[in-house]
C-alpha cells in the first residue's frame, strides 16, 4: 500500500546484511534463526544486541545498522515492516531518505532499551504499552488483561525506538 510495507528477509548461514542507514522506520520480527544487530550513530555510539526466534525490535531512524546471522548452518529469516512507501511518495527524494544528516538521539532511548529493558505505560485495558527498542521473545512477555475483549484475553502494544509504527501482541481465548 501507500503507507507501510512488509518484506521478508533471509540472511544465509554465517551471512550478514548490507550496512544500511535511512530515515524511514523499520520494525523487525524474527521468524527463524538467531543472530545479532549492530547499530551505530553518527557520533560513534554503538549498540549491539542478540536476537532469536520471536524477537521484536526497531532500528532507530537514521542510524547505521547491520544484521548478522549467528548460525553457520541455518538461515535467519525475519519480517520487516517499514513506512518507506509513505516517505518516498511524500518526498520523492532518495538522497533525503538514505543520506540525510539529521540525527534523532531521542529515538535511541536509554542504553538498557537495547537489552530488553523498558518502561510500562499503563493506560487502559487494550492500550497498555511497553516502550523499548528490543524484546527478546514476545511469546514469553507478560501481556496485560483485556477482559472487554473476552474472558482470559490479554494484549500489549509495543512502542519501539520511540517510533510511530504501531504493533501489538494479543492473546484472545477461543470462542470469545
Predicted regions and their residues:
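A short, N-terminal "cap"/entry segment at the start of jelly-roll beta-barrel domains
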Residues: 1-2, 95-169
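A generic "binding-loop/recognition-motif" signal
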Residues: 23, 63-64, 84
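Short acidic-glycine-tyrosine-enriched beta hairpin
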Residues: 41-62
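A short hydrophobic beta-strand segment most commonly corresponding to one strand
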Residues: 27-29, 58, 73-93
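Asparagine-centered strand-capping/turn motif at beta-strand->loop junctions
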Residues: 68-70
Amino acid at each position: 500500500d501507500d503507507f507501510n510495507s512488509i518484506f521478508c528477509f533471509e540472511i544465509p548461514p554465517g551471512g550478514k546484511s548490507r550496512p544500511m542507514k535511512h530515515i524511514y522506520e523499520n520494525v523487525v520480527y524474527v521468524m527463524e534463526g538467531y543472530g545479532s544487530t549492530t547499530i551505530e550513530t553518527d557520533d560513534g555510539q554503538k549498540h549491539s544486541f542478540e536476537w532469536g526466534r520471536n524477537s521484536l525490535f526497531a532500528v532507530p531512524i537514521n542510524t547505521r545498522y547491520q544484521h548478522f546471522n549467528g548460525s553457520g548452518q541455518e538461515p535467519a529469516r525475519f519480517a520487516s515492516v517499514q513506512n518507506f512507501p509513505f516517505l518516498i511518495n511524500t518526498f520523492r527524494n532518495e538522497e533525503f531518505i538514505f543520506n540525510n544528516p539529521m540525527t534523532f538521539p531521542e529515538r535511541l532511548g536509554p542504553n538498557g532499551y537495547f537489552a530488553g529493558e523498558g518502561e510500562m505505560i499503563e493506560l487502559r485495558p487494550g492500550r497498555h504499552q511497553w516502550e523499548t527498542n528490543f524484546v527478546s521473545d514476545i511469546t514469553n512477555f507478560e501481556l496485560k488483561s483485556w477482559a472487554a475483549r473476552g474472558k482470559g484475553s490479554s494484549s500489549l502494544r509495543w512502542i519501539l525506538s520511540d517510533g510511530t509504527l504501531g504493533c501489538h501482541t494479543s492473546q484472545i481465548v477461543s470462542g470469545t
